[in-house]
């Protein structure tokens, strides 16, 4: 078969296969071009899920008439000169417009700010027509009709009009978060109109724009992030642990203003929340990374959704450290969604439906309380109510019973004891975040009162978090006890993996794992963490080698130790069904206030909810 040059149309269609996957890909490229042109208003109109019509209108700088033909030619751009590593624009490859024109009917109209009239060019299946004069306000309009008509096989892979329209909306929202000073609007026959008014610049404007996308509730449950390390700056907002979602669709990451889908960034985000939310839940976050363009490669893929950092360990450490610090400094704070859910449940059941119903035989009457027999009361004793009077009940794996308690059994963990001063005035306690304990219901929930709210605490979940944090602090305060192996276990690894693992030997030793290099391609394991008991040493070493190769950290071993501590905390905390004295309840509340992350238990569930007095008054029609 003879080797020959491909035609320009075929080349563009091949490029379109990489850049233009669906209608949303077209919108992404066109909106990014509008932003690069300095637009402050961008309007998007679609029809047929974008397969029939896509139109993007902006008020940017425009394109001169003599450059319109170049704009729809491959590898022609105004955003890049001779340094491919110094990329400061969203677009730079010069492939989007010619790729779109090769698989659709493209019309490009533009009028520069200083021009008296506009001009347009048309590209149909890769064939150029124009330029010619046209009536147009200042700015640019790009209209794409019959997408993929020139490559009908691609249409078979399109989803329904509704799904494609939703994908377009998601793309505009994702881009819009990073540019709050720009007004975005979406309209069309296949959608409900949507608009994001400009909010300005700065952190407050960004949070307001995020609220337009994620809803007002995010702002009420968000923590600000602002940290910098070695020339890399991280800013943005993350949700408190109890404000989480069932999927990762509410996670947004930007590198120098560019929306990215980078698994390393989202992996670091997951790691920062590793022990404060459940494994099947996902944090809500909007993160902005700003760094020298020379330190990141955005030219990994034509779609520019993936990036490659020169120092990935630095980026991961910055993200994990900054978020963990923000969570620790946030104090005790519940998600507003918990209280909202309770209020909605009250409103859904209501009281009106019950007013006309016949009264049950055992219902309340004014005199019934006088003749009702007293409710039976269970006997209380310090052994049943006071966790400090009993050892941790480690009903878990044998390794926990035999090794875990031996290693951490002497750790002083928070207990719901009577440390609170009985003489302390309730008024002073009511001024504290969790207030003063007023009652315990069903031997599981503590009802507390603050100056302007009612707080309900899950005593087991709350104390479980307190014990877990105490055990974690003990793990980090001193080296973990190791258990010597009678015969060292030899693990064969690739030579580079063995060298990397041996380089982390000192860190691993702090966690009770003694390793040393045994020849060019092997690791000798002489000691394992005592609290882990019997374990698959071969698998552990290989997993650690993979983690060090990818992230340059050995967090996997730390996570295993934390998991053991979490199990011990679960079995060593105040159990449900235990009656507590008022002093003990107040002591638990004070410990919660002093412990970072105590708003959620080890499994990610909330430890308490708070109902504002104003909301309670609304339930009773007082407001």
From Swiss-Prot:
**Under the cellular component aspect of Gene Ontology, which terms does the record hold?**
mismatch repair complex
What InterPro entries would the database entry show? Answer: DNA_mismatch_repair_CS, DNA_mismatch_repair_MutL, DNA_mismatch_S5_2-like, HATPase_C_sf, MutL/Mlh/PMS, MutL/Mlh/Pms-like, MutL_C, MutL_C_dimsub
GO molecular function per UniProt: ATP binding; ATP hydrolysis activity; ATP-dependent DNA damage sensor activity; mismatched DNA binding
Q: Where is this region: Disordered?
A: 353-389
Q: Which SUPFAM superfamilies match?
A: ATPase domain of HSP90 chaperone/DNA topoisomerase II/histidine kinase (SSF55874), DNA mismatch repair protein MutL (SSF118116), Ribosomal protein S5 domain 2-like (SSF54211)
Extract the Pfam families matched here: DNA_mis_repair, HATPase_c_3, MutL_C
Per the record, the GO terms for biological process are: mismatch repair
Q: Which SMART domains match?
A: DNA_mis_repair, MutL_C
Q: Which domain of life is it from?
A: Bacteria
Q: Where is the composition biased (Polar residues)?
A: 353-368
The membrane spanning regions, by residue number, are none
**Signal peptide boundaries:** none
Keyword terms, alphabetized: DNA damage, DNA repair
What is known about what this protein does? This protein is involved in the repair of mismatches in DNA. It is required for dam-dependent methyl-directed DNA mismatch repair. May act as a 'molecular matchmaker', a protein that promotes the formation of a stable complex between two or more DNA-binding proteins in an ATP-dependent manner without itself being part of a final effector complex.
Annotated family: Belongs to the DNA mismatch repair MutL/HexB family.
What's the protein called, per UniProt?
DNA mismatch repair protein MutL
Organism source for this protein? Brucella suis (strain ATCC 23445 / NCTC 10510)
């Amino acid at each position: 078969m003879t080797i020959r040059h491909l035609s320009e149309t075929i080349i563009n269609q091949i490029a379109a296969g990489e850049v233009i996957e669906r209608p949303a890909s077209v919108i992404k490229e066109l909106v990014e071009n509008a932003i690069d042109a300095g637009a402050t208003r961008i309007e998007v109109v679609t029809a047929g899920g974008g397969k029939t019509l896509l139109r993007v209108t902006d008020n940017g700088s425009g394109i001169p008439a003599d450059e319109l033909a170049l704009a729809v030619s491959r590898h022609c751009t105004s955003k890049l000169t001779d340094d491919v590593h110094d990329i400061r624009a969203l677009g730079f490859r010069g492939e989007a417009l010619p790729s779109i024109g090769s698989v659709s009917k493209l019309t490009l109209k533009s009028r520069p700010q200083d021009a008296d009239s506009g001009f347009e060019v048309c590209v149909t299946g890769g064939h150029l027509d124009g330029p010619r004069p046209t009536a147009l306000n200042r700015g640019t309009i790009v209209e794409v009709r019959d997408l993929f008509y020139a490559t009908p096989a691609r249409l078979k892979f399109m989803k329904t009009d509704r799904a494609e329209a939703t994908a377009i909306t998601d793309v505009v929202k994702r881009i819009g978060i990073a540019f709050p000073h720009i007004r975005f609007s979406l309209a069309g026959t296949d959608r409900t109109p949507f608009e994001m008014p400009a909010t300005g610049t700065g952190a407050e404007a960004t949070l307001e724009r995020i609220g337009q996308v994620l809803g007002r509730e995010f702002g009420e449950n968000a923590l600000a992030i602002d940290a910098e390390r070695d020339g890399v700056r991280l800013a943005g907002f993350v949700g408190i642990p109890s404000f989480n979602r069932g999927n990762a669709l509410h996670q947004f990451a930007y590198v120098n203003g560019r929306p990215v889908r980078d698994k390393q960034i989202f992996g670091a985000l997951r790691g920062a929340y590793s022990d404060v939310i459940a494994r099947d839940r996902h944090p809500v976050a909007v993160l902005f990374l700003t760094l020298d363009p020379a330190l990141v490669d955005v030219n990994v893929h034509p779609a520019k959704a993936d990036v490659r950092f020169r120092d990935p360990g630095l980026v991961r450490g910055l993200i994990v450290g900054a978020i963990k610090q923000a969570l620790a400094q946030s104090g005790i704070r519940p998600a507003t969604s918990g209280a909202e859910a309770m209020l909605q449940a009250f409103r859904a059941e209501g009281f009106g439906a019950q007013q006309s119903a016949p009264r049950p035989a055992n219902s309340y009457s004014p005199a019934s309380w006088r003749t009702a027999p007293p409710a039976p009361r269970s006997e209380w004793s310090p052994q049943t109510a006071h966790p400090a009077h009993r050892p941790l009940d480690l009903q878990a794996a044998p390794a926990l019973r035999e090794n875990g308690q031996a290693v951490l059994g002497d750790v002083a963990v928070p207990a719901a004891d009577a440390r609170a001063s009985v003489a302390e005035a309730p008024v002073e306690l009511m001024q504290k975040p969790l207030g003063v304990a007023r009652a315990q219901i069903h031997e599981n929930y503590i009802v507390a009162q603050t100056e302007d709210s009612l707080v309900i605490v899950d005593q087991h979940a709350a104390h479980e978090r307190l014990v877990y944090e105490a055990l974690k602090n003990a793990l980090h305060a001193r080296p973990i006890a190791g258990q010597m192996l009678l015969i060292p276990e030899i693990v064969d690894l690739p030579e580079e993996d063995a060298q990397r693992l041996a380089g982390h030997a000192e860190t691993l030793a702090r966690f009770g794992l003694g390793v040393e290099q045994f020849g060019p391609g092997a690791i000798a394991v002489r000691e394992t963490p005592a609290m882990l008991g019997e374990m698959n040493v071969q698998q552990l070493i290989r997993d650690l080698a993979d983690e060090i190769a990818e992230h340059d950290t050995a967090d996997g071993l730390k996570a295993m130790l934390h998991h053991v501590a979490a199990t011990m905390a679960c079995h060593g905390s105040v159990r449900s069904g235990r009656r507590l004295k008022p002093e003990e309840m107040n002591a638990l509340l004070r410990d919660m206030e002093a412990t970072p992350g105590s708003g959620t238990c080890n499994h990610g569930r909330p430890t308490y909810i708070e109902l504002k007095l104003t909301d309670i008054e609304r339930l009773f029609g007082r407001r």
